[in-house]
């Protein structure tokens, strides 16, 4: 199927949401940089690639930042994922209130590198904006750690993808450039054992998390996909864990046969919080096949993220 020979140089859409969140984040950080907090290190998770508090690949029921009951909090993050054929950079902002409400904004910049060149689109970047919201519904992972009731939260992620010269191909495949994910998460902290477990159910139409649009011809309904995380708190500043995220396979088969087959994601990570306001995460990630019609190898690689929270 011929691809439109367009260049990925269209003007970026105005980042109104990011500007508002950045202004609010700066004000909150200045106001609360020296405020005391009772929140235990790392129990608020880190920031996922979609912007929500949790692990690197999946949201948890925890609320991000250092805010506790009655407090406002803010967190900013920058991440990079590098695999055999692709590189993705992520930046995000998170606002929280009362350890119950969370609003996030993330931007993903996915460099297609050799795959873009093979498709006749050299220099192609897939850019996605993600506006998210989460609310804690019941439980408290820390204060009620002696109870069997987990902390439970529900969230939404509104995603818009700027596919540049790939947009005509996505349209031919029946994929949309706008989508909404809905999820519910349950997080249980076994404080005495230093063990945290999380389960998430996500309703989604996303192809490769939305980077290849949403849905496809004959596959335009929501799928319910499970996600799991486990983390061991080795001490108050260091955690090790793993995540698994099942994903739909809407573009397999397609006009390209199995050339857009999609696999599940997983990672093995280590998170370190040298101070109350800073955390660093590194991980080995396995993202499976991404456009195997061109990039035939599975996309394994590294993930690194830095988060600043107040």
PLM regions: where:
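Surface-exposed beta-strand-turn/loop segments characteristic
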Residues: 113, 208-210, 214
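Cleavable N-terminal export/targeting peptides
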Residues: 1-46
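Short, surface-exposed, charged loop/turn segments at secondary-structure junctions
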Residues: 168-177, 201-203, 212-221
């Amino acid at each position: 199927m011929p691809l439109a020979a367009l260049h990925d140089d269209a003007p970026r859409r105005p980042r109104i949401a990011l500007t508002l969140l950045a202004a609010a984040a700066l004000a909150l950080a200045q106001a609360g940089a020296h405020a005391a907090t009772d929140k235990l290190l790392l129990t608020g998770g880190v920031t996922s690639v979609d912007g929500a508090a949790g692990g690197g690949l999946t949201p948890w029921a925890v609320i991000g930042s250092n805010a506790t009951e009655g407090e406002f909090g803010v967190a900013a993050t920058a991440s990079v994922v590098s695999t055999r054929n692709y590189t993705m950079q992520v930046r995000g902002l998170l606002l929280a209130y009362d350890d119950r409400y969370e609003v996030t904004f993330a931007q993903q910049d996915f460099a297609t590198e050799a795959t873009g060149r093979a498709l006749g689109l050299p220099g192609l970047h897939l850019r996605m904006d993600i506006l998210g919201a989460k609310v804690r519904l019941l439980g408290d992972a820390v204060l009620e750690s002696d109870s069997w009731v987990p902390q439970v939260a529900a969230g939404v992620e509104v995603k818009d993808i700027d596919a540049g010269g790939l947009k005509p191909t996505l349209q031919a495949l029946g994929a949309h450039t706008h989508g909404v994910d809905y999820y519910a998460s349950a997080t249980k902290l076994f404080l005495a054992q230093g063990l945290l477990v999380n389960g998430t159910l996500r309703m989604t139409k996303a192809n490769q998390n939305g980077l290849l649009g949403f849905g496809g011809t004959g596959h335009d309904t929501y799928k319910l996909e499970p996600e799991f995380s486990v983390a061991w708190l080795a001490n108050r500043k260091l955690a090790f864990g793993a995540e698994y995220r099942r994903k739909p396979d809407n573009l397999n088969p397609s006009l390209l046969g199995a050339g857009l087959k999609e696999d599940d994601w997983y990672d093995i990570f280590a998170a370190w919080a040298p101070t109350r306001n800073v955390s660093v995460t590194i991980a080995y990630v396995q993202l499976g096949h991404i456009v195997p019609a061109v990039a035939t190898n599975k996309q394994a690689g590294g993930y690194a993220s830095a988060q600043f929270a107040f």
